[in-house]
Amino acid sequence: MATELSDAEKRKLLRERRQQKFSNGGASSRLNKITGQQQNSFLSSTSVLDEPKVTPSGNKKSSNVSDEEVEKSTKEIQDLLSSIPGNKDNSETDAAETNPEVALFQQLLKMQQQGGGFQNGSPDASTPDLFSSLLNNDTNTTASATQMLPNFVDEKVLKYYKFKVSKLKSYIILIKWALLAPYVYFIMHPNPTVLQASNLLSQIVERSNFFSIFTGLEIVFISIYYQMLKKLQRDNNVTATQNAGGILKYLTMIPEGILPIRNIQGKIGLALEYFDVASMYVTDICFVLVLFGVMKYYHSSFPISVPIEPPIAGIQ
């Protein structure tokens, strides 16, 4: 009666069959069959199982040195290293090994402090301090980089500043138009003798003097507006560059040195301020031209009766 094999015995038999199958080059042929390699392939077609095993030689030289002698020699080496002057700690040695640049700067710093490498143990006065020069260069580089960076302002502060500027501009325009409207009315009046009570008023309402008086008023009001605008910029820490809008956002993407103009962002911001002031002058000119047309139509539609003076006695 045949006895049933256990699972361990079955695995053992399968392992032995596989080893017999892979012996004598069977592993290499199975590997080539799986990978599809041919015999003339450049890749290695020999299986690891078919490679000859290298048996390590058992003729190792036994060490005759006892543990006590090893400890003694190690202690002597440590004493010798500790007796060397200027020997660094293990932490400094590890730092020097991991970062040789740090070790070089530490050595140079020690030479600067001790005056080593100079005659008579003192540094030469004509030789610049290496670390002072490095620190000064680093400080100057950081300062210049900080100046080149745009000064960012809080969005709420910028919105409040723009609101104040719009309010100031509206007040200036309303005051100017309140003065220009009656002035144009009297200039376009068909009866010039209405305001001839004094010589000054007659000169003001003279049409030939209109452009000079209008330009003088514009210069005064634009100067007031520009000075108050600068005061708002100082109070809110806002510059012309920050208030320029989206144009400078595209210019900041251009690297420094590509454009031939230096500080082009500041120049464009200042040009936009001047353009704003010039646009106010052009707006007032357009307003005056409209007033001329309205007043001419008004006086022609509603003529004013001019009183006829009685004839002087004795004159026929």
Swiss-Prot record:
Ranges of Basic and acidic residues composition bias in the record: 7-19
Swiss-Prot/TrEMBL keywords: Endoplasmic reticulum, ER-Golgi transport, Golgi apparatus, Membrane, Transmembrane, Transmembrane helix, Transport
Gene Ontology biological process terms in this record: protein insertion into ER membrane; retrograde vesicle-mediated transport, Golgi to endoplasmic reticulum
GO cellular component, one term: Golgi membrane
Subcellular location: Endoplasmic reticulum membrane; Golgi apparatus membrane
Segments in the Cytoplasmic topological domain: 1-167, 230-276
InterPro entries assigned: GET2, Get2/sif1
Residues in the Lumenal compartment per record: 188-209, 298-316
Compositionally biased tracts (Polar residues): 22-48, 56-65
Start and end residues of each stretch annotated as Disordered: 1-75
Record field: transmembrane: 168-187, 210-229, 277-297
Superkingdom of the organism of origin: Eukaryota
Membrane topology: Multi-pass membrane protein
Subunit-level organization: Component of the Golgi to ER traffic (GET) complex, which is composed of GET1, GET2 and GET3. Within the complex, GET1 and GET2 form a heterotetramer which is stabilized by phosphatidylinositol binding and which binds to the GET3 homodimer.
Protein role: Required for the post-translational delivery of tail-anchored (TA) proteins to the endoplasmic reticulum. Together with GET1, acts as a membrane receptor for soluble GET3, which recognizes and selectively binds the transmembrane domain of TA proteins in the cytosol. The GET complex cooperates with the HDEL receptor ERD2 to mediate the ATP-dependent retrieval of resident ER proteins that contain a C-terminal H-D-E-L retention signal from the Golgi to the ER.
Similarity-based family: Belongs to the GET2 family.
Record's protein name: Golgi to ER traffic protein 2
Originating species: Kluyveromyces lactis (strain ATCC 8585 / CBS 2359 / DSM 70799 / NBRC 1267 / NRRL Y-1140 / WM37) (Yeast)
Gene for this chain: GET2
